[in-house]
Amino acid sequence: MSNIVILGDIHLADTSEYKRATSEAFLDWFASWEQNTNDNYLILTGDLVDICLLTGRVTDYLERFIASSRFKELHICVGNHDKKKILGIDQLAYEFYARKTNVHYYSEISEISINGKSVLMLPYYLGTNDQGLTMTEYYSQLYKDPHYSQYHDLVVGHFCDDEFSFSGASDTVLNVDKLQEKNGKVCLGHIHTRNINPGLFIGSTWACKKNENDPNRAAWVMDESGCWHEEKLPVFCEYLEVSYPDPLPESKAMVPIYTVLNCASEQIARSQYGDIYIRKTVAGENEHRSKQDTSISVDSVKGFDILEYFDTFWETSDVKDNKEAYTLCRQALEKRA
């Protein structure tokens, strides 16, 4: 018996110790996963990486992932994090996978056959296609296209349904319900949580942010008869809060990740909790406290390290990928530290 197995967005990353640890935990699990056999076929919904411009470590993650795969074929629906235009040139993080004869990635709409099942791949794209249409314009009308409106056993996409997104957003596709009516199964990546529509969105393989905790993540599995079931995934990571110096809350995750409240620096947190994975430290008792609330404990002030605090701030900022800005700001702080 051969199965078609689907995994949601993976987001391999090394921009923090906890992201490295989660990536490592996933790779270790994947290598021994019982579905990872040469009888089965794997589909990935995209976003294998968190950032398209790769470090050496993430390149290593991608190579280890493909080296440990025993699947007969691996099919990837390209996501928005996988492909970027850098210096005017399209860059795909795992373009070197093209050298593998049993690995296929799809950067444009594609009809393929996997284990005798008809599959329509709808990858994410920015700008316009060769018809001058945006992703929203093109995919939203597929249900009435003479060619693509034909029945498929499976449709895999990397975008958001208009029912659960902002009006006019570039990652939004309309009429997904009509695609569902015309096809056997629609599976969407891109959205990391499943609670909005667990029958449509597979969700990411693990929580990439603190508001994405979910102990019920799953792979989707279709057997040769076309029947579907879910296979629960391990909890690769979990985001938790602890108020310094209280005991750490329990977690069954492979990588528990802590926000330490009432603590001004990672150095102080580690003096209490040792070698844990820290998302950030917060000087007050609430990460979202009001600007007027500036109270912190006396213990939290001791040993305050401005450079360490800056690094923590930068990791959680919207500009954390701007290496040049980080270097300039940190050098200025080093002169004053």
Q: What is each of the regions a protein language model found here?
A:
Residues 1-65, 71, 138-152, 337:
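N-terminal active-site segment of His-dependent metallophosphoesterases
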Residues 5, 118-120, 238:
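Conserved beta-strand elements of the Class I
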Residues 6-8, 42-47, 73-81, 85, ...:
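Active-site neighborhood of phospho(di)ester-bond hydrolases with catalytic His/Asp-centered motifs
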Residues 15-18, 46-66, 83-100, 167-173, ...:
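Metal-dependent catalytic neighborhoods of phosphoester/phosphodiester hydrolases
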Residues 36, 223-337:
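Accessory, non-catalytic peripheral segments of nucleic-acid enzymes
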Residues 66-71, 147-149, 176-182, 251-252:
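Short, conserved loop/helix-junction motifs that constitute active-site signature segments
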Residues 75, 82-177:
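Conserved catalytic scaffold of divalent metal-dependent phosphoesterases
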Residues 162, 167-231:
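Conserved beta-sheet core of the metallophosphoesterase superfamily
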